[in-house]
């Protein structure tokens, strides 16, 4: 073929070159038309190869040129860089030479800096090496922790699975579930103690975290309900410790980040606050005076005897406040800032009394120097302001006297209201003995003496409950008891009338002795009134106690009747004494008028006289002891009350020592050598007289309230008396007395004591108010001397120390036209509140009756349900026995058919001849045979 035919045209061949690649590595694609022949294709391929080779050579040459040009450019750049570095080095060298020429100090600094830099580099390298070592150690620790967390995670998963299985097996309503959960959680807790809770919780699933939260909540509930569990104390302590550790371990760890820290802080503060509250309660209990003594007495003698000592402690607290007011605001300011002894006639012993002023008999009667001291009313000066503080002595004296009475009213009424609120809930008498049997013991007692006291207290409480139950079920002859009670009241009235007449007779005799002069009589005539009152107060309660045996009252009601009778006796004696004092006051005032007239004559004679001409007389100076003075009836009243308190105290203590201590010694040491049994016969050991001692306290306090205005020392004397009485009577009760034969619960007696104390407070303030308002004070003694009435000190203070408008407002407010409507409004408010309280009480009683009726119905339903369940169980048991007997009879009949046939002619079954079945006697037919025949 010709060559031009074999060469492909441009339309038949096209060459494509990849532009993204180098020319050397280009790939040529030849596309030939499909209609060309094979020869043409081969020729074209050969031509293409040749062309490719030519093009490759041209491209190689071009690339070599390019590489040569690039290398030349790089060499030029390197040469330029070398010139630049040489220039810079020259410049640096010049700078160094200049610095060297400037001075050698800069070189030294640079060398030191270079050294420091070297050291810093070395330290950095050392630190880097240490950090690398630490990183290696941390990695090792993390690896160990991860392994521990994985093991703990597996353990917690296993325990949670076990808890789920136990929850599925047991019902959620039973109480045993909480116990089993507590045991499983305690086991899981003991295993996971050594591992941190946070790491374990981080690897738990949400479901497992919820289960753990539920477990924590259940542990909390278990801690709150642990007291009500019927478990031994050892088990309670173990469960409590385990639950607290579990809650502390997982509760705070369930939070996240700041919340977890805040929760931990709250828990810590809550624990500290609870500990502080517990310690503060213990501190308050430790600060209560005589608490352990009273508890010991209550454990051996019951709550009735302990109520007296509690009442005595309460009275001690009131007298402590009264003593603080009188001592701090009356006695101390007068002793420190008032005029000293001997400066005024009222502060000086008269000349005729100086010889006997320090005798013991005189001081025992509070005369002599004791009379002219801060202990009594007459010593105080009537000056408005005393000392550098300008202390208003008359105003302070009056306000303290009124304030002590007001404080006493407030405290007594508040205590009565609190006792009424405590007693208003009612007593739950259902299952009384069961509660006492199973809940009385305190398992935290660790002292043998405390355990003995608790045992005695439980025994006494059982005796009290038995007496209450017996009295509620007692059914006596009504007509006989009414007759005996009327007779007892008639005898008591006769005793009261006789004691009143005796006191009136003695008072009239004492007035006759006073007119004739007490110096002419002995000790008994001078103290006849006080001694008769003390003896009546000692023997009349014993007579009332004997009479009360006829009435056959409940011990608590008998105590209240006894207290009421002794109250009437003491009240009559007290008011008879007050009437006698009023008569003595009138005599003193008449004597005072005579002294006033004599004072004018004495002063006239003192300053009138004859003097010779052209001479000067020396100034007249009269010693305060030589100045005539009035009788000062206020000091006389204060002395009488102080003597009465002292005589009553001494009578009480002597009676205690002779009537209790000597009697107990006689019975204890002469019982073995006497004709009869002294312990159970006459005289026997004495019982503690609750009623007499309580009334003694109440009337003693009434005399303090009545006489404290005229003798500021009375609260201090009463405080000392109560303090000594507490220790002496506690000792006498525990050593010399025996418990009462009929021990009763005195829960309602405390408010009865308060009611009598309130009556005595009211009756004792009436005479003091009468003397303050109606009787004018003495002219030469006391802080109110020179005033027409004692309460005028208020009006004087308003006029001198306050603005005019304030005194006008006070005068308008004290107008009877405003006071009487205000009092009427108060009476109406009291009546309204009393009526509403009665309705509330009635509603409460009805509600209580309904609740009791519902309780009785529930008891009946429970009994019927229990009987039904017991009958069902009995029927099921009988049915099971019948089935077992019938099955055994059928088996015997199948094994021995001949014996069964032969036994049909006998009167008893063959089973009774051999081994008898349970619950049947041999020789009697059994019911299972009938059941087998029916089958």
UniProtKB/Swiss-Prot annotation:
Location(s) in or outside the cell: Cell membrane
Record-level GO BP terms: cellular response to mechanical stimulus; detection of mechanical stimulus involved in sensory perception of sound; vestibular reflex
Keywords carried by this UniProt record: Cell membrane, Coiled coil, Ion channel, Ion transport, Membrane, Transmembrane, Transmembrane helix, Transport
Gene Ontology, cellular component aspect: plasma membrane; stereocilium bundle
Basic and acidic residues biased stretches: 37-47, 54-79, 109-136, 152-163, 172-184, 874-886
Chain intervals for the UniProt region annotation (Disordered): 1-21, 37-204, 874-935
Principal location class: membrane
Entry superkingdom: Eukaryota
Chemical reaction(s) catalysed: Ca(2+)(in) = Ca(2+)(out)
Tissue-specific expression: In adults, expression is restricted to the hair cells of inner ear and lateral line organ. Expressed at higher levels in the larval lateral-line neuromasts than in the larval inner ear. Expressed in the sensory hair cell patches of the ear at 4 days post fertilization (dpf).
Biased composition (Polar residues): 899-919, 926-935
The family this protein is said to belong to: Belongs to the TMC family.
Known function: Pore-forming subunit of the mechanotransducer (MET) non-selective cation channel complex located at the tips of hair-cell stereocilia. Highly permeable to calcium and likely transports monovalent cations.
Protein name: Transmembrane channel-like protein 1
Taxonomic classification: Eukaryota, Metazoa, Chordata, Craniata, Vertebrata
